[in-house]
């Protein structure tokens, strides 16, 4: 029961100088793995070249994943800079990480998870929101289990209900 999970969006940040892997849950799982912990990225990518590339990058980094291939495009965020260099983000909707399925494998992972970091952004669509909540409900209860809620208030991709429900379910709150 010592697995640490980053659950939610795995995507490409499309910057003026090119694309790079993005998504707070994936970054969380990667950085945790750098400290020697057994971590997993839980997400979905499309059955497309962008999805293939994300899986390849994670494999090259030695990052363990539980990523489903789904019939939606792999997520992207268009990043542009305004006149004074402040980044603006256009987060595409109807993408793979909006549709993370709850599978038997995911249930088994939840039963062996010590800590999970999940965010508000990945709950913008009902399918992934249901999966995240089922994962949280399946995890063992106890003081040693950490349920870290990463609030991300971007582009209006949240509701009061999602925020309140997630705050009730977590025992660690990360405010960005």
Residue ranges and their predicted role:
Residues 11-14, 118:
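A short, mixed-charge helix-start or loop-turn motif at secondary-structure junctions
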Residues 10, 45-47, 122-124:
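Residue-level signal for short, function-critical loop segments
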Residues 3-4, 13-86, 93-100, 104:
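Substrate-binding N-lobe of the ribokinase-like
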Residues 8, 43-45, 151:
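Short beta-strand/turn micro-motifs composed of small residues
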Residues 1-5, 57-67, 83-175:
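Ribokinase/PfkB-type carbohydrate-kinase core domain
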